[in-house]
Amino acid sequence: KRRPVDTFGAFHYDVAYQKTFEGYLPQSFDALEAALDLLRKHPDYIFVIEQVILAREFLRRRPRRKAAMRRYARQGRLLFAPGMFTMPDLNLPSGESFVRNFQIGRDWLLREIGVEPKLCWMADIFGHPPQTPQLARLCGYDAYMFERGRAGGEDALFWWRGLDGTRILTQWEVGTYYGIALYLSDYAVQRGDEIGFRRTERVVL
């Protein structure tokens, strides 16, 4: 049985990993320019920017692109998720740093782009503390999506209940680091029930 699959463009950006902060910017800016070009050419195209620090640095160096970014964001085609200032490592910082990271990112988005993030998409981060649902909901997120930290065997779409009882709609990215394309093969048909893909009717984005 064939099923429709909605996809969106995105790329994971490391603020600093194997290069310096400045060392990653040229390649990242090329990706953003390509995304803006696709948004202009294709009215159904959607692109997601993870971290506000990248959008801020991009517009500092290329302010002429701000109008386009604001326009596509208002149209709901340029999204920011999680829209924090940087992508956090939740195994290390405190709850205070989670909130401050969100606050700085959200304030910049509201001021410069005119949008507020609603999906807490934690791509390629380590750790999901049990208070995350509470923190995410208090920050104004409607849903949570993550990649690392799950081996499968359960539904990919579920309600995550935090320590205080707060619930948030949560989507595990089927395929994790290797992407969902791996699971759109005959292999997926054989393992669909095991990874919960067949029971996933929609994603949160």
Question: Which residue ranges define each predicted feature?
Answer:
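Catalytic-domain carbohydrate-binding cleft regions of carbohydrate-active enzymes
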Residues: K1-L205
